Amino acid sequence: MKFQIDKTDGNARACTITTAHSVIKTPIFMPVGTVGAVKSLDALDLKEILDAKIILANTYHMFLRPGSKIVKEFGGLHGFTKFDRSFLTDSGGFQAFSLRTNTKNDDDGIHFKSHIDGSLHYFTPTSVLDTQYDFGSDIMMILDDLVALPADPKRVKLSIERTIKWAKKAINYHLQKRESGVGLNQNIFGIIQGGTDENARKFCAQSLCELPFDGLAIGGLSVGETNREMYDTVEAVMPYIDSARPRYLMGVGTPEDIVENVERGVDMFDCVMPTRNARNGTLFTSFGKINIKSARFIHDDTPIDPCCDCYTCKNYSRGYLNHLYRAREITFYRLASLHNLHYYLHLVSDIRTAILEGKFLEFKKDFYSKRS
């Protein structure tokens, strides 16, 4: 993987990440394809309509079904899904945490029960990498010890101790595998934990920056803290994250979260929000969100957002989308998801343009003024 910083504007950065499968201009938002597909969309939608350069797939779900060996038989995620651009795969630790299916963490990994059939499994720092080697993902995330917020200080301390221990195991294992010819085009990111404790975050960040990870992620946020706590935590930890590597804020978030955290130096984002909200009838626009299922749109022949040039806005009206939603027509999910993801991808593209032009603060002011 190649990484270069193209321009900075304050702490905001416009960078370029080059993997074996695509060139990724940052800031970037990664659509979430939990089970190898972004819900209601296929690879052609992602490539030809949205022009997505990278998407995320979930190790927990793909490990349980269909299984990493089956994915490998098809040539990894790229061959299996026919999305031939970049994939980032998470470690599965967050799903084991969030689904709470008899999950138990110990010093060596995470025990969990499958939400599908109740079978018992154990994720370790090395086993999740073996799974991701089978997937052939371009960016692999290490296993980390995640805690819900607010958290007891003793639990936060244990979390960062385990996360650092697991990070060392993971990077050493990855370097050994590369020497044997495995994972040569695969990159590995460390994950910084520490809750909202600034000293814990600082210690974890400094410890992980000593290791030769290709990039660094901030994990364990958007799990119960306030927006202000999130922003303050990111701002506090950022000076201790190596600026020469990509910075990824995991599982975040709203358009406002993206703008605020780009300002603090984050390069990469992912979240299920645009597709989940789309399926529930909430659509993002340049002037805020609208609820397309509202009766006030029944006779509305205008597009979702007059300023949007997405496939849905160029071809269909609010009234038609309102009808599709009320009729529970599956076509609605595709059209709404295309719009919301287009909004997110163009938001980060517009932010990048503003950074390159040295106008990020002007962009931010305009962004919020349209929502007031």
UniProtKB/Swiss-Prot annotation:
The active site is at residues 90, 270. Its EC number is 2.4.2.29. Keywords: Glycosyltransferase, Metal-binding, Queuosine biosynthesis, Transferase, tRNA processing, Zinc. Binds 1 zinc ion per subunit. Substrate binds at residues 90-94, 144, 193, 220. GO terms for molecular function: metal ion binding; tRNA-guanosine(34) queuine transglycosylase activity. GO terms for cellular component: cytosol. InterPro entries: ArchSynthase1/Queuine_TRR, TGT, TGT-like_sf, tRNA_ribo_trans-like. Signal peptide: none annotated. Zn(2+) binds at residues 308, 310, 313, 339. SUPFAM superfamilies: tRNA-guanine transglycosylase. NCBIfam families: Q_tRNA_tgt, tgt_general. Belongs to the queuine tRNA-ribosyltransferase family. This is Queuine tRNA-ribosyltransferase. It comes from Campylobacter hominis (strain ATCC BAA-381 / DSM 21671 / CCUG 45161 / LMG 19568 / NCTC 13146 / CH001A).
